[in-house]
Amino acid sequence: IPGVMVWSTFVLAIVLAFVKPLWAIYFIIVFDCYWLVRICYLLIYLLNSWFKYRRAVKINWLEKVKKIMGWEKVYHLIILPTYKEPVNVLRTTFGSLAAINYPLDKLIVVLAGEERDQVNFLNTTQIIEKEFGHIFFKFLITLHPKDIEGELAGKGANATWAAKQATKLIDELQIPYEDVLVSNFDADTCPHPEYFSYLTYTFLLHPNRTRASYQPVAVYNNNIWDSPAMLRIINNSTTFWLFTDLARPERLFTFSSHCMSF
């Protein structure tokens, strides 16, 4: 339906220009006014989210979370589903994890690969494990089997398999499930240095924390200056759109890299 409405609008404007030129002028003026009002409306939400974001990133959230009793009991299970990702992409991701302002001995990192990409994945994991495996509390490698009956191959299936394998590790370590936060990241997600401290702070103060989902701000600027001009425009436009949605409670949803209680 949205596609039909878009093309109908274009076709109607062109047809009216020949059949009823005056109507076409009125139609275009109304259409332009509609989008002017809508852009101003969205700009308010965009600026609201942007100023909140800028204030949040300037705060040392680790200092604040340390004032909450029991913060050190919280562990973060980070699942990174991959499929044919080159080692330099994963190296950037793990480099950002290693640089966060949060105790790394509270992080359980799962690098989840696909059996369809087994050779490339195992070669990549050897490099990543050698460089970063020792800096986290636990570093787990999983391989999602192919052709599981009734399963649709994709990130969700890979992450689900990885979570099931991580559950065995958490049970062995006897960590209470309510003390574990699961972050389902994309393979190229680079968290802000304060992200996990802020996440822990929010989690501990939430009145119903084990029944909530936590959606971070997604800013698509990892390799923006290495991307083609058109892709940069698309990425920036997506970032702006997501910022406007963050300020609208009725538009909140989880996507891409998000977190919830185990």
Where are these regions (language model features)?
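N-terminal membrane-anchoring/stem segments of glycan-assembly enzymes
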Residues: 1-67
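A short, charged/proline- and glycine-enriched loop
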Residues: 69-76, 178
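Hydrophobic targeting segments
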Residues: 73-82, 94-97, 106-113
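Short, acidic, metal-binding catalytic loop of nucleotide-sugar glycosyltransferases
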Residues: 93-106, 116, 131, 205-206
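A conserved acidic beta->alpha catalytic loop
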Residues: 113-128, 144-149
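Long helical/loop segments within the catalytic core of UDP-sugar-dependent glycosyltransferases
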Residues: 132-136, 140, 145, 151-171, ...
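Short aromatic/hydrophobic "clamp" motif used to bind/position activated sugar donors
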Residues: 182
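The conserved acidic donor/metal-binding loop of glycosyltransferases
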Residues: 186-190
